[in-house]
C-alpha cells in the first residue's frame, strides 16, 4: 500500500533529522511534485533540502508528478475547485489526489481539516502521533526517544 506524505509529516522528520525512522517503518513513501517543490523553496533551510534530495536519490521518496490529462490531475483539479467551504492547498490536494488514485494512505497531521475528503473518498490517514506511537510499540523508539520526539512535535 502506498503511503502518500503531505508536507507537514515529512517536514517534521526532516527537521528533527530522523528520516531513518521513516525508512525503518516503510519501504518507500510518495510525495507529490507540489510537496517536493514546496520543500525545495528558497525559504526552507538547506539541511532539509539536502536530506530530502538524498532520500529521493536513493529512491526511498518517490516524487509523483501531477500531469495534465491524467486521472490524477482530474481528481486534483476537482479537489481544488469543488468545495469552496473547505479550501485545500496545492500540496494537500495533490497528496489527496494521489492517495485516491492509488488507494493509498495519506500521512497528514490534521485529519480534521480534511475529514470530509477522507470520508467521501474512503481514505485512511495516519498522523505523526500515529507513527511515533507505532515506532514506540515496535520497540524502534525507546520511551525517552518517544517522549523527546513527541514533545518536539508540538513545536512543528
Task: Label every model-predicted segment.
Residues 108-109:
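Short beta-strand scaffold positions
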Residues 112-156:
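Acidic, PIN/NYN-like endoribonuclease modules and their adjacent C-terminal/linker elements
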